[in-house]
Structure formats: C-alpha cells, structure tokens
C-alpha cells in the first residue's frame, strides 16, 4: 500500500455479505479450502473458544446451501487453524504462537516450522512453500518440507514499518477479476520507478489479512478492532526481480463485527467468497462467535 492511497484502497475488492454459516455452539475460526480434486470444499475449525480447548474439527461445506453438512473429530489441535493446498495436498497450519506446525492430511504427520511468531501467510509457488512472516516490513521465508528449516528470501523493501498489518488467509493464484486494478497500480509504479517489464501472472498471488488497532482509546481501554486488508505478492515484481509486496485496505461491511478475521477464500461456481471469523470482543470470553461468508467482487 503506497502512502498516497486513500482508505479504503480504491484498488481493493468489495465484500458483500452472503450469509452467516451456522456452526456448532462454541466452535470458532473455520478455514475452508477447495479440495485439490476440485470436487469438495473441506474446512477445519476450532471446537471451542475456551483457551485450553484446542481440538480441531474437520468439516465439509455444501456448495449449494453453503451449510456445513458433516463434522468429524481430528487428531489436530490448533489456536486458529488455517488450511491451504501445496503440491496436491491439503495442509492445516495450527497457528500456535511461537510453535507453528503443519499437519499433512494425507500422511497424518506434523512438520514443525522452525520459527517464532504466528499468523504466517503460506504461499505455494512452483512446487516450493514460502510464507510471509511480516507484512511491514516485508519479510518472507522458504520452508524445507523435510526438516522444517527456513531460509530467508531476499525481497524488495519499501522502508515501511507498521505492526498493525498481520497475516490471515494463505496465498491464492492471481485472479484477473479481483486483482487487476491492484496489479495494474503496482505495475505502473514499477514501470515509472524501475522500468520493469509487464507482469508474469504466474508469479503473482493475493491473500487477506487483519489490521489490529484500538478505536477511541489506546489499549486496554479502547475498542479492539480487526479490519481487513488485501495483500499482493509478485515473486519477480521488485527491483532486480526480487519479490514485492503491496497492501490494500478493504472496506469492511457494516454488518461485520469489531474483530473480523479473514480465514480463507473459496471458489464456488466461478465466484470467489471470503470466510471470516468474527466477534465483538477479543477471544476466550463468553460471547457470540460468528462465521460469515462474503462474496468478493471487483473494485468499483
């Protein structure tokens, strides 16, 4: 996100509320993924909001009614699980703070990612797995899928430092409908500043994260807010062909709750939908926890 962009960004897609997805009482943070075969939508959610109750359920989503039609217990535990596809396999990220693991749903094995932090945004690119560690400044690593070791990726830096921007969904392949204006704005900037050639869309990915801040008053007296932003990574978009990252603030719908975390993007009948985990207060308290579905449409 360049400093001159308005809030919300004119290059970000629009969110239109479709429905609330009914879920088991007390369960929270459902992340959905189109199966590698393209036939089903599977998901993973935390069974209870209570701080020490971290069992993860697997579910399937009916693509016509958009209602969960099957719940199953799993051996997975997680804080706020995220699901993504890498090399034809669905992985579930447990997203524990300073103790992140990936669960391979085929082999039923865990891989410990040797890093600290959480809210890592994974991107499967040309058979290799990467993750965004920080949004601002942009920090990216590549994962060794045998050992869990990580290697720093040399990326373009723009000098920004803003800890409000945090990860959410994994990365998805460039979408010409949702991302065109954002990528065009990036390319115009790159062309004027660095003389880069036109983008290679095979190298471009997008996802969504949450921006954390307190409204009206600072912590702990202010109102906790999680707003949504879109990120776009171009693996060759920066100076000297380095990966580049741009952020675009999204206009949150009026019905969205104070804490609105994007968990995943799914495709149904050639349309893109975002799934969110929402509440009015921070987690781990007795309150209404909501799983919402929004249709994503091009920027106005």
What is the predicted function of each stretch?
Residues 1-300:
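Beta-propeller domains
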């Amino acid at each position: 996100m360049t400093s001159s962009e308005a809030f919300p960004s004119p290059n970000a897609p629009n969110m239109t509320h479709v429905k609330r997805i009914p879920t088991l009482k007390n369960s929270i943070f459902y992340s959905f993924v189109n199966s590698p075969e393209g036939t089903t939508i599977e998901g993973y959610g935390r069974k209870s909001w209570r701080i020490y109750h971290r069992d993860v359920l697997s579910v399937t989503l009916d693509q016509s009614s958009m209602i969960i039609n099957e719940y199953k217990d799993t051996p997975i535990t997680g804080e706020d699980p995220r699901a993504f596809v890498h090399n034809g396999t669905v992985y579930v990220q447990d997203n524990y703070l300073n103790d992140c693991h990936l669960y391979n749903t085929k082999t039923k094995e865990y891989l410990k990612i040797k890093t600290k932090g959480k809210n890592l945004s994974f991107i499967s690119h040309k058979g290799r797995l990467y993750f965004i560690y920080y949004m601002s400044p942009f920090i990216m690593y590549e994962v060794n899928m045998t050992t869990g070791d990580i290697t720093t990726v040399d990326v373009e830096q723009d000098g920004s430092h803003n800890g409000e921007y945090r990860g959410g969904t994994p990365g998805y392949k460039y979408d010409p409908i949702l991302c065109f204006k954002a990528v065009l704005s990036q390319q115009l900037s790159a062309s004027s500043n660095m003389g880069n050639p036109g983008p290679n869309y095979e190298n471009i990915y997008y996802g969504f994260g949450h921006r954390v801040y307190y409204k009206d008053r600072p912590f702990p007296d202010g109102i906790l807010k999680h707003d949504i932003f879109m990120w776009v990574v171009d693996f060759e978009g920066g100076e000297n062909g380095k990966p580049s990252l741009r952020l675009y603030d999204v206009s949150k719908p009026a019905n969205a709750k104070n804490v609105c975390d994007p968990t995943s993007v799914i495709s149904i009948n050639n349309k893109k939908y975002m799934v969110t985990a929402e509440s009015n207060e921070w987690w781990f308290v007795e309150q209404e926890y909501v799983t919402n579905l929004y249709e994503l449409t091009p920027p106005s």
